């Protein structure tokens, strides 16, 4: 059996310009994007690559990969596609003391992705074919804008996205005027989504949804704080529009079901 000989994190830093948006960590402007690439080496010379979330915490994620994940995986057999879930479950169980979300899961996810890449390389097929048969040859992409805050600038960025060929827009705005500005800029036929990043309580989220109803958003994503308030997340859609809680709640499939 092919064995894992090492798991190593590589930090990649890319200069970044947010343009008209205010892309900050606290009061500090973010001018670089940090990516943590996870390399899984084997005794057969085949290497798998993954991506561990390192947004503003690349050192922490990389350290978790090198000092928590690598010792757990080193020396184990390389799983095939069917064996990856059980392999990753073992890793999660061994490291559950360090948290079921946050840095630990960021590092674990990088290993998970790398194992899928490795499994495809061993089979000699593209990863998409290993996962399953293709249902379509083209996938539509939407423009996911940063939080901008000013209606006029939001409208301008939406128009720029359309000129670049995007056929749907996702905002990260939390005020009704900015959402209306986007809808006016893109017209009635373009899908519009709003990702809010958990700023409101249930009453505020419901009021915001009603205020934006005329813009016909496909969904409001992460409107409620705290993101694990499942009861409120279930209540707001009954009084407003569709809510998509998404990534801040997900640990495998448990919270998705909730």
Set out the residue ranges of the language-model regions.
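N-terminal small/glycine-rich loop or linker at the start of catalytic domains
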Residues: 98, 123-147, 181-183, 187-189
């Amino acid at each position: 059996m092919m064995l894992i000989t090492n798991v190593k994190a590589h930090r990649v830093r890319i200069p970044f310009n947010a343009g008209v948006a205010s892309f900050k960590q606290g009061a500090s402007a973010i001018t670089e994007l940090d990516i943590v690439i996870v390399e899984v080496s084997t005794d057969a010379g085949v290497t798998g690559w993954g991506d561990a979330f390192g947004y503003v915490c690349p050192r922490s994620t990389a350290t978790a990969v090198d000092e928590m994940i690598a010792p757990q995986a080193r020396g184990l057999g390389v799983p095939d596609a069917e064996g990856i879930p059980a392999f990753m479950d073992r890793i999660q169980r061994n490291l559950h003391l360090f948290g079921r979300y946050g840095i630990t899961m960021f590092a674990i996810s990088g290993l998970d992705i790398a194992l899928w890449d490795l499994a495809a390389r061993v089979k000699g097929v593209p990863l998409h074919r290993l996962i399953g048969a293709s249902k379509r040859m083209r996938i539509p992409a939407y423009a996911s804008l940063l939080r901008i805050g000013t209606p006029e600038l939001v409208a301008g960025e939406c128009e720029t996205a359309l000129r670049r060929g995007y056929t749907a827009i996702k905002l990260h705005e939390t005020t009704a005027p900015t959402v209306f500005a986007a809808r006016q800029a893109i017209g009635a036929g373009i899908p519009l989504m709003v990702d809010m990043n958990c700023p409101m309580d249930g009453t505020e989220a419901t009021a915001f949804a009603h205020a934006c109803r005329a813009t016909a958003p496909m969904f409001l994503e992460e409107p409620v704080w705290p993101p694990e308030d499942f009861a409120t997340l279930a209540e707001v859609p009954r009084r407003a529009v569709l809510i998509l809680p998404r990534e801040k709640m997900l640990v495998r499939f448990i919270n998705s079901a909730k």
